[in-house]
């Protein structure tokens, strides 16, 4: 429980906002100034992802990363710090997310209120079609490996971290919550705690959710500029296909869409279903048992709450120490509320 408390203090420094294109259940308030809060240092760096090299859709292997260093970092030269890696959701990048969650003000306030000082890292995983799904694909590159190994290795090599898994937390919201779930299941060698917020895409997608109009819109996409003209959910289908049904023999997008010639493609949907964590969680229970703490957060009127509950139930069945918190539905989440649910 001590570890859970420490991890929750760590994640107190980070809260979330749903991307603006979606009907938001929660929004973050601009934080009030906390007496005695000291400024953190912000470094905007580029990290090369070996795992992303040669991806077919041309996404950059050099990724933007925002690193937030605690107030004592510059003065206490011999001190080392735990690290939290935070994964943004679909359609936004790391820089936009920092504005939506009011970083660095939130971090400064959390430290002033007693959260243990740590390094917080926000990597950018936005792609041609607005999101990598934090997965592994020849089309997008191996973002799973990039997060779990490339970035971790870089941060450990260039900053004064405590370089072991028990001093690393992985946090994500929405698609980032999916990423934290997926990567967390497969890479317990890299992280010691998981905090999963409103995770999407935990269960397989039903064929009935696909529309003929979407097929025609997707077929018209030949360039990244064409992709930018799509509606939110249409573009998300391209991102999903690029990540989960890549096809190196199908230019220019190098993916297989879920519909073709007016018909659902069952083989493609089977590939998508194979990437649903609820379908493969049982294979990684040994890894999940390695975590000191796993927490899941979701709104009590969030459409994602059922799948989040199912994930918690599976973990509980196997004896994993998992906390599930359901926030009361509201349009704004205030910081005292966030503090109480930690």
Predicted segments — roles?
Residues 1-6:
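Positively charged n-region of N-terminal signal peptides that target proteins for export
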Residues 20-24:
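Sec/Tat signal peptide C-region and signal peptidase I cleavage site
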């Amino acid at each position: 429980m001590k570890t859970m408390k420490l991890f929750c203090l760590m994640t107190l420094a980070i809260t979330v906002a749903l991307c603006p294109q979606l009907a938001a259940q929660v929004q973050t308030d601009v934080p009030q100034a906390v007496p005695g809060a000291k400024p953190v240092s912000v470094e905007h760096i580029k990290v090369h992802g070996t795992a992303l090299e040669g991806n077919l859709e041309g996404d950059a292997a050099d990724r933007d990363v925002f690193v937030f260093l605690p107030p004592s970092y510059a003065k206490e030269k011999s001190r080392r710090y735990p690290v939290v890696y935070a994964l943004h959701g679909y359609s936004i990048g790391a820089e936009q997310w920092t504005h939506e969650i009011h970083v660095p003000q939130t971090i400064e306030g959390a430290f002033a209120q007693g959260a243990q000082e740590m390094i917080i890292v926000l990597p950018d995983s936005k792609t041609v079609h607005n999101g990598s799904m934090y997965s592994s694909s020849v089309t997008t590159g191996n973002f799973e490996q990039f997060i779990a190994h490339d970035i971790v290795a870089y941060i450990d090599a260039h900053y004064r971290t405590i370089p072991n898994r028990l001093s690393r937390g992985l946090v994500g919201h929405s698609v980032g919550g999916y990423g934290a779930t997926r990567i967390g299941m497969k890479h317990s060698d890299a992280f010691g705690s998981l905090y999963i917020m409103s995770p999407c895409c935990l269960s397989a997608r039903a064929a009935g959710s696909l529309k003929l109009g979407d097929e025609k819109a997707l077929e018209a996409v030949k360039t990244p500029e064409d992709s930018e003209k799509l509606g939110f959910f249409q573009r998300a289908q391209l991102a999903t296909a690029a990540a989960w049904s890549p096809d190196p023999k199908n230019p220019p997008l190098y993916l297989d869409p879920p519909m073709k010639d007016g018909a659902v493609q069952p083989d493609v949907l089977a590939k998508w279903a194979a990437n649903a964590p609820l379908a493969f969680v049982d294979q990684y229970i040994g890894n999940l048992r390695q975590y000191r703490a796993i927490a899941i957060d979701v709104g009590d009127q969030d459409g994602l709450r059922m799948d989040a509950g199912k994930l918690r139930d599976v973990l509980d069945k196997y004896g994993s120490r998992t906390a599930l918190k359901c926030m009361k539905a509201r349009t704004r989440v205030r910081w005292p509320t966030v503090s109480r649910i930690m």
